[in-house]
């Protein structure tokens, strides 16, 4: 398995891009807001964009090394790059699109293209043109074309952004299977936390031009560590906080003291609670830990859950978000949060 080593800098219009990470096998996600440098990172790895300094290596091969004056063209990098738009050739058939990226003799190219069409269930569409294909079919053609070349590394840039929401879930299952069969390093760029969670073993959170957090995907959602990571993984409730005990923090924007199941660091600047982690509490219970009296501000009912905006009734400050399953017919007077579900965050 070839190790991808990335360590480069590039000055962008609004901020410097400094990317440093290693990847070896599996599927890795880069989660970040629009404009943070995700796509530019991909372009540098693929050879479409040129860094100002640093190096990019894949195994023992230098794809880019400013000091050694190495900058391989895209066709020599063995990097498969799936663009957001899929970048199919509009005047070529499905068969021709897949065959176009394959090197070798005509008979071998034809055989490989037919093999990939069968694998991706495209044989019946062989003579069709991209304009007549659905978004899901276009994605399969683009992926078949890339994998037909047997790349050493696969880059997927927002792979589902061009698809209708009802198609995404089915295609995510398909893609997960294709990536498993690919068996080499895949990196997915996305701002969609659900895509990242479903597909990626490890996730890197990107701020403006740098990787801020890198860890196992499930661990990232459990303990995101940084405010930006908490927001990008879907945490609606984030308050400024200060330590007020070994296992206690005061959430300044909510006016409530919270107990956690671990020691509170002096570096903590914020605290987070996911909207699904509030649970109804009994007002008469002696268990007062992390119990908050509810003053409802607004509520919205969706087909399968409620979204409720509420304040701490005894010290009303900023709103908090709570989500409840539709089976709960009444909004609770009190809610409670498990100490282990509270997120301790740094700016």
Could you say what each language-model-derived stretch is?
Residues 78, 93-228:
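ABC ATPase nucleotide-binding domains
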Residues 43-44, 202:
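The short alpha-helix immediately C-terminal to the Walker A/P-loop
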Residues 63-80, 104, 220:
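ABC ATPase NBD coupling module
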Residues 54-66:
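Conserved ABC transporter NBD signature motif
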Residues 2, 6-33, 39-40, 47-50, ...:
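Non-catalytic connector elements of ABC transporters
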Residues 39-42, 141:
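ABC ATPase nucleotide-binding domain helices that frame the ATP-binding cleft
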Residues 48, 76-79, 83-91, 192:
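Catalytic "switch" loops of ABC-type ATPases
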Residues 221-244, 270-272:
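C-terminal boundary and immediately downstream tail of ABC-type ATPase nucleotide-binding domains
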């Amino acid at each position: 398995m070839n190790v991808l080593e990335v360590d480069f800098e590039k000055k962008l219009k609004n901020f410097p891009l400094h990317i440093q990470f290693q990847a070896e096998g599996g599927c890795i996600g880069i989660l970040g807001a629009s404009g943070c440098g995700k796509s530019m990172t991909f372009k540098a790895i693929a050879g479409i964009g040129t860094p100002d300094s640093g190096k990019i290596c894949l195994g023992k091969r230098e794809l880019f090394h400013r000091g050694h004056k190495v900058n391989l063209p895209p066709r020599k990098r063995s990097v498969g790059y799936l663009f957001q738009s899929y970048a199919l050739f509009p005047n070529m058939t499905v068969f021709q699109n897949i065959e176009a990226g394959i090197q070798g003799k005509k008979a071998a190219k034809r055989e490989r293209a037919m093999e990939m069409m069968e694998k991706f269930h495209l044989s019946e569409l062989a003579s069709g043109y991209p304009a007549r294909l659905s978004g899901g079919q276009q994605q399969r053609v683009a992926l078949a074309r890339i994998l037909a070349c047997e790349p050493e590394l696969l880059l997927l840039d927002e792979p589902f952004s061009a698809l209708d929401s009802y198609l995404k879930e089915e295609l995510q299952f398909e893609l997960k299977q294709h990536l498993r069969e690919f068996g080499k390093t895949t990196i997915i760029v996305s701002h969609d936390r659900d895509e990242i969670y479903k597909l990626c073993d490890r996730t890197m959170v990107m701020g403006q031009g740098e990787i801020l957090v890198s860890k196992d995907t499930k661990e990232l959602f459990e303990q995101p560590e940084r405010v930006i990571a908490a927001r990008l993984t879907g945490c609606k409730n984030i308050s400024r906080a200060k330590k007020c005990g070994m296992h206690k923090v005061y959430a300044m924007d909510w006016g409530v003291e919270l107990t956690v199941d671990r020691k509170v660091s002096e570096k903590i600047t914020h605290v987070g609670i996911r909207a699904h982690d509030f649970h109804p509490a009994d007002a008469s219970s002696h268990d007062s830990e992390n119990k908050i009296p509810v003053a409802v501000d607004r509520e919205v009912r969706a087909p399968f859950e409620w979204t409720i905006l509420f304040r701490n009734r005894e010290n009303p400050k900023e709103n908090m978000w709570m989500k409840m399953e539709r089976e709960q017919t009444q909004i609770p007077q009190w809610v409670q949060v498990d100490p282990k579900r509270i997120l301790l965050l740094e700016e």
